[in-house]
């Protein structure tokens, strides 16, 4: 078993705090509209330049094992805030540093750590409730744009792009961020349902200049099995040919004789047909086929429920205004499905999202909601160099998460004002069960000024003066670090998503509480120290032998 190094009490806490400060000091320089960049060296390629707090935190590993434990615990705060709200990582880190340093000072003065922690927890719970009370819904496109702009470090073009994307695909739509090819940002919107399966044979192509298959007002047959025998599909083909409409076949697979016959019929112009594989695998494929069925008012032909492909009729086929198939994707535009049924299906999938514990499953279910409810928007980030593109892509990603959080739980005044206001209101009435809990409450409420102070410091102004002026104000009154003016934060468009502020505070207080109540730290001895320890033990054994 490895030899361990153990530290107790104040020795352990001092080391831990040093690690916390190193990580937090590196992260907090990025906070606010005048926050600075951090350059991260990479093992290969150009360095990365970022203003994203969690990207900075993830890079930090310290040589001293005890200091590193402190740093890693604060890194967890940033990661958690990023996972839940997608933004607010720097705010969470600043709050954690402030609560930990104030808390450890109180512990060093002889206070009981457990009572301090209980006081901190009470203060945080009360402030979270107050944040919910002052939160207002984020509904207009202008508010969405403002949230996106603030989160992208005051880049208005990013805020506008995200607001446009949400307007086009709806608040439930999928918005993805990709590398662009030019200098300017671009927004591509895919309307209708798109899935990543292309045509099964290039002979189906009827628009050779674009290399695509386009079907106008087609029938759509959905089959939950492989089709290899043409006799199974023949009755449907004949019925569709009589109706004079094209046909799209979506099945687990179409192969052999069946595919060859479809290709021959298409090339001879007897019937206009195209075949694609069904999206997904296993149970997810069944669910997605059902989604397409509801969107196009069709029925999934499945042997599991006693249906036979040979007996399928035109009534069981779905329909859409248009279908476009490329080598890699199929897009169904304007399915004729019933609006009420589509909404009911969306509600059902949303319930599955709430019940799911897997991030991957949640993401896939969210994609299904978007395909049914709105569409897919792709923001293509443009920049002059790859380094600049990476930095901008990080900011767009943060802004996108922030706007989603704002739509979900509403918005509060930004610039650290919401926490100051909530803490002020709570301080008048909140008391603990004993004096040490009261100290915990006070230090937590004092720590909630830290994000405002850091934003002001990063803009080169006097943090104490600004913090006092903001505390003396009321409502949305705060400090705009961009223009260096005081005013109404909501009117100036400085907004934070409630979810981001709430998550940052809760995660920071949770980890800080654990660190304040730490009395002992254990780590492996570094290799050189291990060798010295083993040599010393060996030397003592030799001396015993001589005697």
From Swiss-Prot:
Record-stated family: Belongs to the chaperonin (HSP60) family.
Superkingdom of origin organism: Bacteria
GO biological process: protein refolding
Protein's cellular compartments: Cytoplasm
Residues the record lists as binding ATP: 30-33, 51, 87-91, 415, 496
Gene3D superfamilies linked to this entry: GroEL, GroEL-like equatorial domain, TCP-1-like chaperonin intermediate domain
One GO MF term: isomerase activity
Protein name from the UniProt record: Chaperonin GroEL
InterPro entries in UniProt: Chaperonin_Cpn60_CS (IPR018370), Cpn60/GroEL (IPR001844), Cpn60/GroEL/TCP-1 (IPR002423), GroEL-like_apical_dom_sf (IPR027409), GROEL-like_equatorial_sf (IPR027413), TCP-1-like_intermed_sf (IPR027410)
This protein's record includes keyword Cytoplasm: yes
PANTHER family: 60 KDA HEAT SHOCK PROTEIN, MITOCHONDRIAL
A single GO cellular-component term on record: cytoplasm
Coiled-coil segments: none
Function noted in UniProt: Together with its co-chaperonin GroES, plays an essential role in assisting protein folding. The GroEL-GroES system forms a nano-cage that allows encapsulation of the non-native substrate proteins and provides a physical environment optimized to promote and accelerate protein folding.
EC code(s) of this entry: 5.6.1.7
Keyword terms, alphabetized: ATP-binding, Chaperone, Cytoplasm, Isomerase, Nucleotide-binding
PROSITE patterns named in the record: CHAPERONINS_CPN60
Record field: catalytic activity: ATP + H2O + a folded polypeptide = ADP + phosphate + an unfolded polypeptide
């Amino acid at each position: 078993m490895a030899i361990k190094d153990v530290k107790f009490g104040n020795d352990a806490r001092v080391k831990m705090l040093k690690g916390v400060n190193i990580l937090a000091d590196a992260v907090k320089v990025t906070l606010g509209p005048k926050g600075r960049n951090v350059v991260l060296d990479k093992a290969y390629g150009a360095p990365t330049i970022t203003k994203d707090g969690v990207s900075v935190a993830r890079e930090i590993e310290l040589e001293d094992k005890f200091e590193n434990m402190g740093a890693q615990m604060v890194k967890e705060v940033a990661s958690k805030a990023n996972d839940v709200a997608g933004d607010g990582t720097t705010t969470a880190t600043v709050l954690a540093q402030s609560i930990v340093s104030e808390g450890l000072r109180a512990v060093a003065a002889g206070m009981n750590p457990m009572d301090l922690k209980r006081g901190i927890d009470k203060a945080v719970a009360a402030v979270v409730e107050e944040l919910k009370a002052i939160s207002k819904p984020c509904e207009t496109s202008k508010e969405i744009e403002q949230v996106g702009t603030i989160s992208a470090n005051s880049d208005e073009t990013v805020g506008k792009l995200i607001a446009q994307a949400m307007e086009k695909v709806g608040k439930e739509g999928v918005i993805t961020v990709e590398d662009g090819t030019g200098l300017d940002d671009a927004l591509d919107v895919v309307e209708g349902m798109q899935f990543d399966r292309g045509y099964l044979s290039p002979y189906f192509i009827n628009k050779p200049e674009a290399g695509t298959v386009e079907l106008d007002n087609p029938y759509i047959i959905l089959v939950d099995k492989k089709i290899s025998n043409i006799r199974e599909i023949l009755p449907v083909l004949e019925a569709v040919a009589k109706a004079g409409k094209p046909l799209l076949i979506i099945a687990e697979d179409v192969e052999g004789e069946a595919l060859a016959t479809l290709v021959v019929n298409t090339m001879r112009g007897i019937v206009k047909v195209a075949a694609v594989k069904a999206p997904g695998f296993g149970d997810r494929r069944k669910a997605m086929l059902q989604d397409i069925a509801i969107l196009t008012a069709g029925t999934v032909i499945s042997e599991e429920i006693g249906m036979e492909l040979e007996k399928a009729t035109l009534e069981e086929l779905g329909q859409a205004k248009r279908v476009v198939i490329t080598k890699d994707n199929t897009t169904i535009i304007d399915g004729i499905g019933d609006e009420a049924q589509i909404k009911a299906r969306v509600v059902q999938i949303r319930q599955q999202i709430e019940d799911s514990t897997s991030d991957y499953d949640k993401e896939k279910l969210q994609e299904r909601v978007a395909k049914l409810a709105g569409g897919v928007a792709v923001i293509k980030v443009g920049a002059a160099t790859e380094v600049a593109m990476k930095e901008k892509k990080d900011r767009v990603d943060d802004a996108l998460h922030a706007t989603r959080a704002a739509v979900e739980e509403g918005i509060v005044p930004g610039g650290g004002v919401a926490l100051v206001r909530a803490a002020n209101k709570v301080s008048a009435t909140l008391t603990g069960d004993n004096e040490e809990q009261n100290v915990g409450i006070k230090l937590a409420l004092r720590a909630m000024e830290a994000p405002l102070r850091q934003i002001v410091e990063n803009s080169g102004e006097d943090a104490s003066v600004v913090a006092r002026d903001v505390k003396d104000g009321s409502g949305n009154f705060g400090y705009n670090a961009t223009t260096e003016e005081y005013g109404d934060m909501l009117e100036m468009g400085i907004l934070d998503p409630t979810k981001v502020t709430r998550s940052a505070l809760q995660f920071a207080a949770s980890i800080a509480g654990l660190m304040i109540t730490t009395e002992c730290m254990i780590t492996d001895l570094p290799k050189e120290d291990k060798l010295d320890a083993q040599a010393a033990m060996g030397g003592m054994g030799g001396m015993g032998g001589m005697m």
